[in-house]
């Protein structure tokens, strides 16, 4: 399993009933989720894999149409305004993680750190990561500037890696704080550091 602590978890859900309150097929549902300061680890597989995530922020932005076919636009939670039930505090929390505003172009975004040790030192790694999934538009893509294309970005920073025999994670005197862990090379293998690794992938739907 997975044991974790979360400083703040925020969820905002809105259902637009459409033109007819009696029909569900014209309803549109909107969901915004923000996870602020998540720390957790894998439990039960310590002999095979030690996996600890720390200082993780995550956001999710989704929209669904009641007919199950139409793909509605997601909300920009940073500019959305409403009256009635006061959702301003919760809405504000959707936009105050380290990932910035939760806009309509974001599906999922995650930022944080991870420390892992596979098979007692065969693969040891520690570093920070940012992942974002969403949409972009560009006149330079075959589908043109009016069509969404799926995009993913992955950035790894300050990564230390060892692959071989006898690697380990040095807790540096703070066994419950993984943010200051360092990778210790083993007796035989390959050790490396990466300041920044960036990957951008775009899929044009045609």
Task: Locate the predicted segments by residue.
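N-terminal low-complexity, acidic/Ser/Thr/Gly/Pro-rich segments
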Residues: 1-206
């Amino acid at each position: 399993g997975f044991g974790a602590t979360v400083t703040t978890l925020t969820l905002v859900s809105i259902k637009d009933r459409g033109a007819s309150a009696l029909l569900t097929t014209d309803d549109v549902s909107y969901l915004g989720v923000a996870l602020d300061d998540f720390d957790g680890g894998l439990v039960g597989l310590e002999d095979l894999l030690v996996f600890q995530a720390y200082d993780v922020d995550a956001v999710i932005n989704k929209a669904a149409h009641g007919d199950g076919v139409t793909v509605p636009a997601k909300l920009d939670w940073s500019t959305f305004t409403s009256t009635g039930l006061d959702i301003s505090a919760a809405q504000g929390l959707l936009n105050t993680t380290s990932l910035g505003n939760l806009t309509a172009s974001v599906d999922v975004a995650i930022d944080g750190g991870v420390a892992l040790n596979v098979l007692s030192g065969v693969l040891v790694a520690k570093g920070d990561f940012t992942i974002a999934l969403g949409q972009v538009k560009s006149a330079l893509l075959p589908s043109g500037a009016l069509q969404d294309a799926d995009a993913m970005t992955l950035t790894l920073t300050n990564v230390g890696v060892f692959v071989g025999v006898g690697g380990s994670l040095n807790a540096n005197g703070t066994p419950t704080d993984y943010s200051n862990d360092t990778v210790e090379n083993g007796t035989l293998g390959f050790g490396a550091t990466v300041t920044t690794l960036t990957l951008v992938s775009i899929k044009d739907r045609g």
